[in-house]
Amino acid sequence: MTRLLAVIFLLGLVTVPASAISMKWKFSTQDSRDFARPDFDDSSWQEVAVGHKWKSAGFAWFRSSITIPDEIDGNPTIGQAVGLRWNACDGGECYVDGEVYTRYDNDHPALVVLSESAKPGELVHVAVRVFMGPDTAEHEGSLGQAELCIVDPKLVKDEFLVTIDPGKRLGPLPRSFAGLSQGAGLPDYDDATAAIFRSIGIKWFRMDNLLTNAVKKNDDGTLRYDWSDLDKRLDFMKKVGCELIFCISYMPEPFDAVPNPERHSYPRDWNEFGELVYQAAKHCVDRGTPVKYWEVWNEFNTGWMVDPAGWDHLKTYTTLYDVCWKAVRKADPTAWVGGPAIASGPWNENDPRGPGVNGEEFMRGLMEHCEKTGAPLDFITWHEYFQPHSIMKKEAEQIKEYLNDYPKVKKQVKEYAVTEWSYAWWHDRAHDNEIGAAWAATSMLRGWMAAGVQKPCWFLAKDFSSGLQGEWGMFTRENKPKPVANVCRMFNSMMPIRIECKGEDEQIASIASLDPDSGRVTVLIVNFAERYGPPRKIRLSAMNLPSSLDNGVCRQYLVDATHANLWHDPARCELSVVREVPIVSANAFDTLVELSNNSVMLIEMGGNSGP
């Protein structure tokens, strides 16, 4: 799948151009994990090279026994870190000498370090299982890249220092990775599902499609309200212990002005639709489950909505917004109303600042409308998928810049909410493995948290289909945690007070926090590269630890290619301690860890219970 996307190139990763040495690979469209074994007999397989194209379903395999050459592009390899840069199909997993080394997708290609200190003539057995797509259909595939390179030794061999100082407190730690989003409702609303969401720390939950089935026809043709679906969701939120972000959508079929099976017609009668919204908000209050957050519609800027004759999308949206906020505030004067829930960033098409689809038109359009009319805008919402963390941070900053032109609205806005965000808007194997999890951690630390976004909502909460099919869910249909769910748990297991934490480069991001009462300290470290990420050696050094940590213990929890990873091992998909290190003295403590690319580690010092 080819995707034109903004990417960050990891500066300094490869210091020597990639080798043009012709490499031969054995290839098969069959699938067996035995193919990763160095001693597997592949003599009957087809021999191919870069540029090979084929069509198949499921998975395909490449194998090669690579001999380290004397030189790569005229540079001696002896003693150098020698790597293989690889990209093929939608993604895949790379094996070195029979063991999983790394996974990749085609927008985040792999770097396989064959040797940290190469010896010419050294033989390394490499196998790659490539993903042909998350479904059972046939897809076209190609071997796009397989080339040797010399890797910057500073990245592979040298220790990267992360320092923390609990004596320097920076205020409350933002609890940003505590929201979910689900379109079209959950597959179920049972107690077990509520319990798993509660256990990982979910505090807000955005849902759309809440009004689609709220109006029913009686046998005599009259209409009635049906709150059964809404009640089910409200009761579920209470069991989870979280706030509902009520996305006012979609149009009930009896209210259509024009037939539209996608439920995106404007209403036949604006007052009639306003009464529905009022009754929904009043119903929430009357049953003792008032809703604080009311978001007006979903991705209106994409052009899905059918407009009244002679109207443009923005006029239709601001009219709908007025109908909704007046209805909600009539039922509950304390409720918050927000929008515009745009798809993609706050820019229009072909804007050099970033991606978007009528984004600036709708973002500014709503702000200007509220500035002129006095309509409330309590929180601002938008959606984003896949973009690098730098783009995500820039989006939030751009929206705040727009607000400077609307001073009355700026005073109203209390929060920013990305009511849908995820690794990709398409089905992708990265949703099921550690790539999506590490991307999410990086996006959270360097994107949303860095920009002050209070309420990101991960899309999707739970898969609709059984098994692993590349769907967006944080959990499978069977309530098994994917790696991203374990990363969410890591974030919500951190202590409440942020402390000084230094240690960041293009790949590594980190954050630390303290519980002043117990003295427990937590550190979260992410290794994620947009392209060609090597493993990194991380030295964590702590000073001024609380005295209660004398003779304590440092516990390490890990999400990577082989740990807490449902894709790799369904029997060991839960987050667990991978290593314990004694803390002899709180005066000074350090520990060395090695993090592969696409990995997230939570380090907990002190305390007897884990996440």
Tell me what each language-model feature is.
Residues D378-A430, S443, V453-Q454:
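Glycoside hydrolase catalytic-domain groove-lining segments
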Residues I21-R37, V48-H52, A118-L161:
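An acidic-aromatic loop/edge-strand motif
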Residues V156-F197, G201-K203, D208:
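Boundary/entry segment of secreted carbohydrate-active catalytic domains
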Residues E420-R520, L524-F528:
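Aromatic/acidic polysaccharide-binding cleft in carbohydrate-active enzymes
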Residues A36, W45, I66, I72-G98, ...:
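Aromatic-lined ligand-binding clefts that engage carbohydrates, nucleic acids, or primary amines
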Residues V285, L540, L545-L595:
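Acidic, Ser/Thr/Pro-rich beta/coil linker or hinge segments at domain junctions
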Residues I200-H389:
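Substrate-binding cleft and catalytic face of glycoside hydrolase catalytic domains
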Residues F62, D505-G552, Q556-H563, N598-G606:
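Carbohydrate-binding surface patches
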